[in-house]
Amino acid sequence: MNIQEEIKKRRTFAIISHPDAGKTTITEQLLYFGGEIREAGTVKGKKTGTFAKSDWMDIEKQRGISVTSSVMQFDYDGKRVNILDTPGHEDFSEDTYRTLMAVDAAVMVVDSAKGIEAQTKKLFEVVKHRGIPVFTFMNKLDRDGREPLDLLQELEEILGIASYPMNWPIGMGKAFEGLYDLYNQRLELYKGDERFASLEDGDKLFGSNPFYEQVKDDIELLNEAGNEFSEEAILAGELTPVFFGSALTNFGVQTFLEIFLKFAPEPHGHKKTDGEIVDPYDKDFSGFVFKIQANMDPRHRDRIAFVRIVSGEFERGMSVNLPRTGKGAKLSNVTQFMAESRENVTNAVSGDIIGVYDTGTYQVGDTLTVGKNKFEFEPLPTFTPEIFMKVSAKNVMKQKSFHKGIEQLVQEGAVQLYKNYQTGEYMLGAVGQLQFEVFKHRMEGEYNAEVVMTPMGKKTVRWIKPEDLDERMSSSRNILAKDRFDQPVFLFENDFALRWFADKYPDVELEEKM
C-alpha cells in the first residue's frame, strides 16, 4: 500500500443541520451511492451481504449508543469517504461539538422552506471557528419553499458567509422541474426518462414555463452581482458552494457528492501545544481521542475511544505512547464503523477514524504518538454549558461509588462538574438535557450509585481570574463555583445579572469559553 496515495484519497467530513432538515436522509443516500446500502433505510453487512434496517438512523427513538455521533465509511470515485454524523437537537451535547474537531470539512443541510434555524447556526459557529470549508445543501425542493435568492441572502446575513450557487432550482414543490447546473453547464431533469439535457435544449424542453424564465433572470442577476467562484475562498471557509436538491427523492444528491469530493480538502495537519503543525504525511503515527462512547447496553460494558489519525499509518498490534500519563498502550482491538456494524481493522491512515477498545486508559483530548515522539496536540476546546443541575448521592453509604462514577464520567466528557465555592455542593453543567439523562442512567447502571438531581435551569457562565476574585462578589443571582480544574467561575442567573455585575465591577475581566 502506498501510504501517500492512500492519504490523498481521504475525505473526512461531518453533516450538520437543524432537526428534520433531512440530514439522516441525505446520509442514507450518500451511503447508497457508496454501495454500503441497497436502498435508503437498509444497511448492508460487508461480509454477509445481508441487509438490516439501519436503526442508528432513528435517532429520536433510540436514546442509547446510537444517539452519539456515528462514523461511516465508504469508497466512491477513487476516494475513501469518512462521514461523521452529528446528532440533532434533543440529543445535542458536547459530543457534537467535539466531533467537529475531527473533520476537515462540513456539509450543512438546510430545509429550503425554513432557511437557517437555531441549531444550524450554533453548529456553524463551531465550524467557522475552525476555519474549515462548509458545503451547503438546500434540501426539500420536492416541497414548496422559500425563494432561492432569499436563502442565499440568509447565509450571508445570519451566518456571515459568502455563497456561490453550483446549481439553481427550476420551480419547486409540485412545479419542480429540475436544476440548472451552473458548474457542469447542463440541465438536470426531475421528470421523464432522461437525467440530463444540454442548456441549449432548455427552451425546447420548458417552452415558456414561467419558472424557467425566472431561472434565466436569476442567473443573469447572479452573474452580474453575485460572488465569484474561488476554490481558495472555499478551502479557507470564506465561501460556501450551495447545492439545491431533494434528499427524499434522491435528486441532486449524486451531483452534489461528485462536486463535493472534487473540492473537499484532503486531510489537514493538526497543531501541537508548541504551535507546530504535524503534517498528515509524516511517517510516524499520531492521533487524538475526540470522543469516548460507552455502550449503554449493560450486556456489553465496552467503552470505545474514537481516534482521528493525524499522521502516518495505524497497524494492528502497534504500541503507542500516551504523553498525558507517560505510559504506553497496545492497539490490538481496533474497529472501523459502518452504521451499527463494526469491522476489525488491520490498518488505517491519516484522515481515518478508528475505534479503540478502552478499559479506562483514555480521556477525551488524549494524544497518541509512537517511538520517541512525546508531544501533545492542542487541547480540545471547552464548551460553555447552558443548563445546570445540583447532584448528590441518594444513599449516603454509596458515596465511594458516587465519587468514582462522577470522576470517570467527567473525565470522559459526559458532563462538566462544578463545585459551589461556599457549600461544596456538586453541580453538573451541560449543553443539552440528554447529557443529564445519560449521566443518571450510567451512574445507576454502571456504578450502582443512585443520584438525586435538582434542576437549576439555564445559567450564563463566565470564568474569573483568581487574582480578581473577592468572595463578596457572589450573590443569589450569581453563584460562585469552581470548575474541575479548580478555576473560579460565576454562574449568572441571566444576561441581566451579568450586565449588572459588569457595571458594578468594571475592572474585573470575565472570560467566556466557546
UniProtKB/Swiss-Prot annotation:
Show where the tr-type G domain sits. 8-268
Protein name, UniProt field = Peptide chain release factor 3
Extract the InterPro entries matched here.
EF-G-like_DII (IPR053905), EFG_III/V (IPR035647), G_TR_CS (IPR031157), P-loop_NTPase (IPR027417), PrfC (IPR004548), RF3_C (IPR032090), RF3_dom_3_sf (IPR038467), RF3_GTP-bd (IPR041732)
Q: Where does GTP bind?
A: 17-24, 85-89, 139-142
Q: Which GO terms describe its biological process?
A: regulation of translational termination
Q: What is its main location?
A: cytoplasm
Q: Which Cys-Cys disulfides exist here?
A: none
What family does the Swiss-Prot or TrEMBL record give for this protein? Belongs to the TRAFAC class translation factor GTPase superfamily. Classic translation factor GTPase family. PrfC subfamily.
Single GO molecular function: translation release factor activity, codon specific
SUPFAM superfamilies to which the protein is assigned, alphabetical: EF-G C-terminal domain-like (SSF54980), P-loop containing nucleoside triphosphate hydrolases (SSF52540), Translation proteins (SSF50447)
What's the gene? Answer: prfC
User: Which PROSITE patterns does the annotation name?
Assistant: G_TR_1, G_TR_2
List locations, semicolon-separated.
Answer: Cytoplasm
GO CC terms, sorted: cytosol
Protein origin, superkingdom: Bacteria
